[in-house]
Amino acid sequence: HDQLKVLKDQGYVTVTQKDIEAYYEEGKPLPKRALFLMFEDGRRDTAIFVQNTLEELNYKASMMTYPEKFEKQDPTFLLPKNLKELTDSSYWEMGTNGYRLEFINVFDRYNNFIGEIDPLRYAMMQSALGRRYNHYLMDFIRDKYGVPAESTRHMESRISYDYERLRDIYTDQMGYVPGLYVLMHSN
């Protein structure tokens, strides 16, 4: 809250996804102190802690989600009903980080090959991990020597499957696919 309050006091105003789109596609200027707020992973606690601040400062933000979490009904994450309530509040817009979060080609900080890990395992191992890993949509799945362990066709199929699942789940659960897609960092 305090950091956003300082930005507000300095004259920063939030911009929406449409504002950014108009800036790039039409050359429409943004405010001098434009701020685009986005919160990744679609966590329930993020919405709980941020909602009052957005209202107090009259700020807008984008909530990025993984539709895989909708299927799993994981209470840590916002579900479609919650997301609809957020967008109805007028302080939130929807975005996506992709169908799911998974790390591939992972090595620990001692260069031991781990392979593929999900976010839970990543969190449990984080202190032993370095920065040698990649996002599952950004590379071939590789062996410990860096040699692709899948064909180009298999990689394309794996990636296509995830985009199709993203589209199908959002369409079914939310009635639309968010227009904003932010891929998690990759190394």
Give the location of each predicted region.
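N-terminal pre-catalytic segment of deacetylase/amide-hydrolase enzymes
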Residues: 1-34
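Aromatic- and glycine-enriched glycan-recognition loops and surfaces
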Residues: 1-8, 41-44, 76-81
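Divalent metal-coordination and catalytic microenvironments
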Residues: 7, 40, 54, 86
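Short beta->alpha connector loops
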Residues: 19-20, 41-44, 186
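Catalytic micro-motifs at enzyme active sites that drive phosphoryl/nucleotidyl and oxygen chemistry
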Residues: 24-26, 51, 81-83
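Membrane-embedded segments
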Residues: 32-34, 38, 45-50
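Metal-dependent polysaccharide deacetylase catalytic core of the NodB/CE4 family, i.e.
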Residues: 32-35, 55-186
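Active-site metal-binding loops of divalent metal-dependent hydrolases
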Residues: 39-42, 98
